[in-house]
């Protein structure tokens, strides 16, 4: 539920994905 300051509209979460973030509603979120 916490925004990870990365978008995933065109490409998946990259840097923030390593921190555990996942794509939700076109934005990378962490819980």
Curated annotation (Swiss-Prot):
Keywords: Disulfide bond, Knottin, Plant defense. Contains 3 disulfide bonds. This is a cyclic peptide. Disulfide bonds join 4-21, 8-23, 13-28. GO terms for biological process: defense response. The keyword ATP-binding does not apply. It comes from the Eukaryota. SUPFAM superfamilies: Cyclotides (SSF57038). There is a cross-link at residues 1-31 (Cyclopeptide (Gly-Asp)). Pfam families: Cyclotide (PF03784). The keyword Disulfide bond applies. InterPro entries: Cyclotide, Cyclotide_bracelet_CS, Cyclotide_sf. The presence of a 'disulfide through disulfide knot' structurally defines this protein as a knottin. Belongs to the cyclotide family. Bracelet subfamily. This is Cyclotide cter-E. It comes from Clitoria ternatea (Butterfly pea).
């Amino acid at each position: 539920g916490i925004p990870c300051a990365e978008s995933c509209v065109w490409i998946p979460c990259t840097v923030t994905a390593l921190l555990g973030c996942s794509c939700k509603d076109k934005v990378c979120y962490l819980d």
